[in-house]
Each structure stands twice: as C-alpha cells, then as structure tokens.
C-alpha cells in the first residue's frame, strides 16, 4: 500500500497543498521552519489521528482556523482506497474511508502501517518502558486482529481497578474487575511475548549489519514475576496496591530490555549509534510485517542527515531501498539525499509552508 496523493489544508503552517507522490522515495527539502516536517506530520496524523510533535490540537491547526483537513489516496495491489481525517479545535475527529463517515482512527492505522524515525525518536531506547511497549504493541496490532480490542478493554479495566483501590478494604471487593482483567492481561502478554520472539531474528540480523561492533540482546519482560500466575500476583499485592492506589504489576508495566555487550544501550552507544539502532529496529519491524502479511510500511524520516556520517547514511538508504516500501525523507539540503534519488523518486521544495516539485 502506498500513498499516491496527499491533500493538506490548514495543518501547521501549510494553508493548502496537493501532492502527487512517488511509490518509492519522496524527498522534502527546505530550511528549518519551512514546513517540511509538517508534511511528514500530516502523513503521520492521517494514519494515527494525532500529531507526533504535539498532543495539543490547537498547535496543529493553522493559526486562526477552526480545523485541519487531510485527504489521501492509497494504492494497493488490487484497489485504491480514499481516506480522510478532519479534526477541530475541540478535538472532535471525523474519519472518512471511501466516501463514508463514521469510521475509527484504528481503521486508518491498519490501512497505513508506518514507521517514524525522528531526532526525538531516541526515547525508544533511552526513554521509559512505555516507548518500548508501544514498539511491541505496534507489531501486535498489525499481526493480531483481536489485539486492539483486548488492549482497549485492558486500559479501561485498569482505570476502573485503580479507582476501586481508593475505596475497597478487602481483596474480595476487587474480584469482579480481576475476573475480567486477568485473562486479558495474560492474552496480551502472550501476544507480546510471541511477537518479540518472532521478530528477534530480524532485529539481530539488522543490528548486526548496522552495528557489527556490538553484541545486542533483547529481553521481553511481561510486567510480573516469571512462572507466577497473574491472579496470584494481584491478590498477593492487594495491600501494597491499595496503599499506592494503582496496580503495580501487569502488562502495563512490561518492557523490552535492549543491551549492548551486556549493558543498557543508553549507557554504551553514542548518539549516532543510537540512531542507527533505532533505524535498525524500525526496519526490522517493517520487514517482519512484510514477511508475515505481505504488507509494506510507509517510512517517515525527519532530518535524515542528523547524527549520521556519509557511510551510515548510505547504509540506511540501501536498506530502505531494499524494502521496496514508500519512503518520505526530510532534509535541509538536497545534497544530503541526492545519492538516494533515482528515476522514480520525487523531490519537493518546501518554503514557508509552500510546497513545489
């Protein structure tokens, strides 16, 4: 699936844009603040319902406008799909697919699997466990049809359980929530464990190519003790949870621990090496999706040249080309991306929110 056309209205500093896109590489070149990252963010938002630079909707809608509008056309092997997203200052969204309203953002996410690589993306490696849970959950979402519903129900039940912890005095009063929570937690943890095991070889192979000087290991931690039933953990920790007023163990505490030569990667790798590792993990995830389902990711890469020397940029470019996926790359100068260009690529110039090709 590739995005063949993108229409943007009143998004960030872009008043209006209508872009015909390449199914291969698309380059966005312009000075800092020109709006090139806003194009990437518009694509991301079309597939996620939210921006990646700000959760405040008022900062995403163009100044003095009431809403932004995004439309796209997705070309699959057999058919074309029209998609659209409108979001106003109150945060209300309208999703349209093939001319009909009433769709969910999750449907857009399923139609547009994408990998985002930005200068802020180091949080996957040096941020808290929630960023690595999100990495695993992306894979589970695209590989397990029941994951999104189970994950949504888990979040709801945990919120209700945490509220109940402020009021109950005996564990028996929590059993109605735990009766629903326990099977969901175990299923989600099983999916995450299976996904992390399935993608392990892809991550190891890609990391070996990108960072041959290190031995990288990946370890899934489910969020409670090994070989202990979740029901037992919840009951045993009731008094502690009640004092904390939240559930201290469970899939919401899971992590994917990543080590280089036995030490945490954030303590061992340079910024350039961390970026390579981040790219390697995103590539591995996209390649795993293609192998398992035949679907390809869109890759969004902001500030391609930062942290990478010429050799490493060349390595990343060659691996991206090998995926045969659609790729969007922003750069300050065309010199940073010209070597990646071929007869099927498109080069866009961005200046003060105006986009030309």
Curated annotation (Swiss-Prot):
Q: State the Gene Ontology terms under molecular function.
A: ATP binding; single-stranded DNA binding
Fetch the Gene3D superfamilies from UniProt: P-loop containing nucleotide triphosphate hydrolases, RecF/RecN/SMC, N-terminal domain
Q: InterPro entries given for it? A: DNA-binding_RecF (IPR001238), DNA-binding_RecF_CS (IPR018078), P-loop_NTPase (IPR027417), RecF/RecN/SMC_N (IPR003395), RecF_2 (IPR042174)
Would you kindly state one Gene Ontology biological process term found in this protein's UniProt entry? SOS response
Where does this one sit in the cell? Cytoplasm
One CC-aspect GO term:
cytoplasm
Write the record's keywords in alphabetical order, separated by commas: ATP-binding, Cytoplasm, DNA damage, DNA repair, DNA replication, DNA-binding, Nucleotide-binding, SOS response
- Which residues make up the binding site for ATP? 30-37
Q: Which family does it belong to?
A: Belongs to the RecF family.
Q: What is this protein called?
A: DNA replication and repair protein RecF
Could you tell me which species this protein originates from?
A: Escherichia coli O7:K1 (strain IAI39 / ExPEC)
Q: What is the lineage of its organism?
A: Bacteria, Pseudomonadati, Pseudomonadota, Gammaproteobacteria, Enterobacterales
